Structure formats: structure tokens, C-alpha cells
Swiss-Prot record:
Gene Ontology BP term (one): Wnt signaling pathway
Disulfide linkage: none
Subcellular location field: Cytoplasm; Cytoplasm, Perinuclear region; Cell projection, Growth cone
Name the record gives this protein: Protein NDRG2
Coiled-coil positions: none
Gene behind the chain: NDRG2
Record text on subunit structure and interactions: Interacts with CTNNB1.
Main location: cytoplasm
Taxonomy, superkingdom: Eukaryota
The family this protein is said to belong to: Belongs to the NDRG family.
The keyword Acetylation is annotated on this UniProt entry: yes
Residues with Phosphoserine modification: 326, 328, 332, 335, 338, 344, 350, 352-353, 355, 370
């Protein structure tokens, strides 16, 4: 009989002295985020150069997650709190991400010369095919905020075969009317560009409260070295055309859509109206309580949870585990309609602040989340 030999097994990822498993997990997450700095590229388009940053590697038979930020922000200030959130890591490990910066909004961007003709929002949408062609990506799941949500919606109308799903936060699909235009001009006489943009991003209650978050973003926008560029993007947003969505008509989004807005947010009415114009069997409406004007900044955990369910409804991440938010609330989720061959689905959720449970509701209703 062969002599038995003693084998010493070493822990693959030993803990540091005094380090708890939770602290080790947080350190590992921080290290992974620090190491993945992304690769930044620029590509020429018919309307000028556009810069974008790619994180991760393409996954076979999976779309890329492509983001587009709002006015006054770039991809980092708009999306970093969301995509660096711990529970989001399970999602981003399964998808390559492309974060697009509007022209002149990227870090270190030079100020455009006087008289520069900034692209319209429609033209910004027409830049996206150049990005996808450069990367050789065929389909995307778009995540946009404010002006970025409009741009992705316009792109989806023009290129429906390349968009598998959309998460549209604070979208206003309507052109400014005469009353809106007059109010904007009047506000411009008494308010600075940074203050007008802050009023676009955050609710009046948030601005009056002057929280640490508001102070941070007021400082970012007020002292932005490319403030002249930001004003050009702002002007393009205010001169947007109507998307002309029509429920049951030819002009509509043909992919699954999740509309998101904060309760009492500046764009709440616009998002509610947008929801009324889209196909209810393809659209989920998430109204988030206590999230203010930028839910991806203030409530990344809740938005991550909703995004995960959205992806599961499209047929991705079916075996995904529940996040801490759901586990802690022993939540249950049921789909209002099963996924068909085209991954079409309609799902509505409501979350009660009293019971703290998720439940399904009839199609077309609001998904309200409050904790």
C-alpha cells in the first residue's frame, strides 16, 4: 500500500489579520473597480468626433450596455455611482459596457471655438452607429438619463433592429412649446446657466435642502472648465424635436422599455405622459419615491434591482441570485406576462413602504418603490 502523504491546503484568498469576510468582499470589489479603468476611444462621425469608454469584454450572443448622460454631466458623474454599486457587479460581469460622452463633455475636453455649431440631439443620435461600427457591436441595451434618454430613444426609432431594450430615466419626449420657450427665456434673464441646469437635474426641494449631493454637483457644474460646451449641449436639448410617440401607431419604441423617474422630480409629468404613449405590453414604469431628480445617484441599489429584473424579463441572467435588497425584504416578484419568442413582456411592480414587499400588478400601472 502506498504511503500516505500529508498535504497542506492553503486558502486561495486568505484574509488579512483581523479582516472580516464582509470587509474582504468590499476590498475585492474596490480593487476590481480600480483595476478596470476602461479603454477610451474617439471616432469621427459626420457631425464631429465622439468619445466613449469601454469596460469589460464582449460576451457571445449578448448586447452591449450603452449609456448616454444628461446635460451638465459626463458619463462618470452621471453613472459611476450606479455602475460601481456592489450589487451591479453581477450585471456588469455579464455585459460589456460602452459609456458615450456627448461631444465636448469628456474629461479634459477643449472648449469649442466661438461660433461652433453643436450637433442637435438628432445628430447626436446619428453618431451612435459610428461607435457601434468601430467596436463591431451589433446590438445594445441603452441606459440614458434626461437628454441622453432622448438621444437613445431617437436612435432606437431610427435603428430598431439594433436595440434590444431601453432604460430611460427622466425622458421628456416632447419639444418645448411656446410657453416653455418663453419661461426658459425668462429664467435665462435671472438665472445663470449652472443654476438652470441644476433645476433641470434636481427637484426644487433638493435644491432648497442643499444636501451634500447638491453641493457636490453644483460645484462640478459651476466650476466646469468646459462650461461653454455644456451650454451648447443645453441649448441643443432645449431645441429638441418632438419624438411623436403614438400608442398603436407606427412611431413607437419596438423593444422592451423601462421608464424611470423620481417622485416629485422635475420631469415626472413628462415621463408619465411618455408612458401613456408607449406600448403597455412592452413598457414598465418605475416611479421611485425618495429618489429626487437623479435616481441613479441617490438610489443605485433600488435601480440596480429593477434593472436586474428588466434584464431577466428580456431572457438574460435567468439564474441570477436575488440582491441584498430583495433578500432583506423577503421580496417576491412575478411577471404580469410571460416572455414570448421576441422577449416581449409587460411587468409592473409596486413596493409598499409599510409592508416592504414587492408585488406584481396589472399591466400599465406604475412601479412605485419606496423604502
Amino acid at each position: 500500500m502506498a504511503e500516505l502523504q500529508e498535504v497542506q491546503i492553503t486558502e486561495e484568498k486568505p484574509l488579512l489579520p483581523g479582516q472580516t469576510p464582509e470587509a474582504a468582499k468590499e476590498a475585492e470589489l474596490a480593487a476590481r473597480i480600480l483595476l478596470d479603468q476602461g479603454q477610451t476611444h474617439s471616432v469621427e462621425t459626420p457631425y464631429g468626433s465622439v468619445t466613449f469608454t469601454v469596460y469589460g469584454t464582449p460576451k457571445p450572443k449578448r448586447p452591449a450596455i450603452l449609456t448616454y448622460h444628461d446635460v451638465g454631466l459626463n458619463y462618470k458623474s452621471c453613472f459611476q455611482p450606479l455602475f460601481q454599486f456592489e450589487d451591479m457587479q453581477e450585471i456588469i460581469q455579464n455585459f460589456v459596457r460602452v459609456h458615450v460622452d456627448a461631444p465636448g463633455m469628456e474629461e479634459g475636453a477643449p472648449v469649442f471655438p466661438l461660433g461652433y455649431q453643436y450637433p442637435s440631439l438628432d445628430q447626436l443620435a446619428d453618431m451612435i452607429p459610428c461607435v457601434l461600427q468601430y467596436l463591431n457591436f451589433s446590438t445594445i441595451i441603452g441606459v440614458g438619463v434626461g437628454a441622453g434618454a432622448y438621444i437613445l430613444a431617437r436612435y432606437a426609432l431610427n435603428h430598431p433592429d439594433t436595440v434590444e431594450g431601453l432604460v430611460l430615466i427622466n425622458i421628456d419626449p416632447n419639444a418645448k412649446g411656446w410657453m416653455d420657450w418663453a419661461a426658459h427665456k425668462l429664467t435665462g434673464l435671472t438665472s445663470s446657466i449652472p443654476e438652470m441646469i441644476l433645476g433641470h437635474l434636481f427637484s426644487q426641494e433638493e435644491l432648497s435642502g442643499n444636501s451634500e449631493l447638491i453641493q457636490k454637483y453644483r460645484n462640478i457644474i459651476t466650476h466646469a472648465p468646459n462650461l461653454d460646451n455644456i451650454e451648447l449641449y443645453w441649448n441643443s436639448y432645449n431645441n429638441r424635436r418632438d419624438l411623436n410617440f403614438e400608442r398603436g401607431g407606427d412611431i413607437t419604441l419596438k423593444c422592451p422599455v423601462m421608464l424611470v423617474v423620481g417622485d416629485q422630480a422635475p420631469h415626472e409629468d413628462a415621463v408619465v405622459e411618455c408612458n401613456s404613449k408607449l406600448d403597455p405590453t412592452q413598457t414598465s414604469f418605475l416611479k421611485m419615491a425618495d429618489s429626487g431628480g437623479q435616481p441613479q445617484l441617490t438610489q443605485p441599489g433600488k435601480l440596480t434591482e429593477a434593472f436586474k429584473y428588466f434584464l431577466q424579463g428580456m431572457g438574460y441572467m435567468a439564474s441570477s441570485c436575488m440582491t441584498r435588497l430583495s433578500r432583506s425584504r423577503t421580496a417576491s416578484l412575478t411577471s404580469a406576462a410571460s416572455v414570448d419568442g421576441n422577449r416581449s413582456r409587460s411587468r409592473t411592480l409596486s413596493q409598499s413602504s409599510e409592508s416592504g414587499t414587492l408585488s406584481s400588478g396589472p399591466p400599465g400601472h406604475t412601479m412605485e418603490v419606496s423604502c
